[in-house]
């Protein structure tokens, strides 16, 4: 992950002391995404969490009510070098927006999508993981629904229109 911006007050209060998480995303055959998170704890441990992002009505859109994420979208990406993700969270009666910028590309063999095989190029996103036992890397992949040129440029602080 290259950068994160949000209007979430909890994030703003703790962003200076946060460490990067590792996220492994696995596309499921039904269109959902299985996610495994690993968060470094202050005492050198690792907190793990598994969850599923449920595919929405619009291709490329997901949600996870358990995490209060009502809208997760790939706002802009070239599906090779970078992705800008838009996330909307609703908690305590407030609506918070997040933008997460990812960069990088998977090295070696191209991953295989369960429905599309290896004929489509994913964007593989790497997140450094700061852990007491040494650095490891996590990665996850975003798969385009159909081969398409990059999305048109969108304003950074407005919710993106469906584009996939």
Curated annotation (Swiss-Prot):
Molecular function GO labels: small molecule binding
A Pfam family of this chain: Lipocalin
InterPro entries in the cross-refs: Calycin, Lipocalin, Lipocln_cytosolic_FA-bd_dom
SUPFAM superfamilies: Lipocalins
Domain of life: Eukaryota
Family indicated by similarity: Belongs to the calycin superfamily. Lipocalin family.
Descriptive protein name: Lipocalin-like 1 protein
Organism of derivation: Homo sapiens (Human)
């Amino acid at each position: 992950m290259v950068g994160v911006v949000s209007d979430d007050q909890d994030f703003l209060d703790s962003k200076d002391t946060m460490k990067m998480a590792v996220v492994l995303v696995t596309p499921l055959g039904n269109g959902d995404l299985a996610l495994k998170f690993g968060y470094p704890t202050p005492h050198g441990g690792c907190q793990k969490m598994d969850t599923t992002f449920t595919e929405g009505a619009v291709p490329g859109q997901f949600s996870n009510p358990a995490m209060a994420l009502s809208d997760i979208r790939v706002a802009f990406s070239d599906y090779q070098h970078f992705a800008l993700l838009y996330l909307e969270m609703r908690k305590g009666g407030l609506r918070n927006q997040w933008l997460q910028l990812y960069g990088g590309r998977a090295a070696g063999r191209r991953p295989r999508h369960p429905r599309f095989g290896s004929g489509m190029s994913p964007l593989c996103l790497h997140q450094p993981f700061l852990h007491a036992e040494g650095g490891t890397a996590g990665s996850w992949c975003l798969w385009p629904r159909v081969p398409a040129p990059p999305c048109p440029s969108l304003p950074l602080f407005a919710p993106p229109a469906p584009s996939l």
